[in-house]
Design a protein with these regions (language model features):
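Carboxylate-rich, polar loop motifs that coordinate divalent cations or form catalytic acidic clusters
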Residues: 1-116
């Protein structure tokens, strides 16, 4: 191998090493979490959405949970109340442009309008 090739290879690896030495380390990300200890009704969450008021909605195995940033309100099926959600196993939650909260359950689709 010629002397010039050796110098080029040496410079290449030197530059590569310097790049690694001066590259920034990624910022450490710290996650916080909400669990049943903080009021979530069930720890398995299938779907999350946020309404226009800033409330977070969580679809779980134990109904739908609304979190206002401080407290949870839990919406569950009540066989004696025809206006409750269709089933406690809520697989998805979504808000629409009209402010309705749509909840997909094992027994059908429920919706709730916070405006009314």
């Amino acid at each position: 191998m010629s002397k010039l090739k050796k110098i080029v290879i040496y410079l290449f690896f030197l530059c590569l090493g310097m790049h690694s030495a001066f590259s920034e380390t990624p910022e450490q990300i710290t996650f916080s979490y909400i669990s049943i200890n903080e009021g979530l009704s069930q720890s398995t969450v299938f779907s999350i959405d946020q309404d226009k008021r800033g409330n977070m909605w969580f679809a779980t195995y134990d109904g739908v949970n609304k979190f206002d940033g401080y407290d949870f309100t839990i919406y569950q099926h009540d066989a004696s109340d025809p206006h409750s959600i269709a089933n406690d196993i809520a697989r998805t939650v979504m808000t629409d442009s009209q402010g309705r909260i749509w909840i997909g359950t094992r027994d059908g689709l429920s919706w709730y309008n916070e405006e009314k």
